[in-house]
């Protein structure tokens, strides 16, 4: 469903190519993360259209949406723990830290309001 560059060794390898959403999972929010992943799956066209790659962060490891552990190193600028999700823009900067529950419309509206995304939408017409 999501394209994933398995050659990446660091989140910065996605810079200028993809936006990244990281869902932080702890023993206290498993249901929220599961719900968020299901929402993403049912909105795959919205996710893909915006060049979003989704990861889950659990026990200091980034996992793909298929649940496979990656060797990708998490940026030191990201929090070690968080009860929510983080959006990283194509420029590599943190664009949002939002608590659960995850709302796809909130995410897509935020992305669509960004200058880079507006430029992408104009060039895709």
Sequence positions of predicted segments:
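Non-catalytic interaction/Regulatory regions outside core domains
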Residues: 2-125
């Amino acid at each position: 469903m999501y394209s994933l560059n398995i050659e990446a060794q660091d989140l910065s390898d996605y810079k200028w190519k993809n936006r990244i959403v990281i869902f932080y999972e702890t023993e206290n929010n498993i249901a929220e993360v599961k719900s968020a992943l299901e929402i993403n799956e049912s909105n795959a066209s919205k996710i893909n259209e915006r060049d979003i790659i989704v990861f889950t962060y659990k026990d200091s490891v980034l996992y793909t949406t298929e649940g496979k552990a990656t060797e990708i190193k998490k940026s030191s600028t990201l929090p070690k723990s968080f009860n929510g999700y983080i959006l990283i823009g194509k420029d590599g900067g943190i664009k949002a830290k939002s608590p659960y529950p995850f709302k796809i419309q909130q995410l897509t509206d935020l992305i669509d309001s960004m200058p880079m995304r507006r430029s992408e939408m104009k060039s895709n017409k």
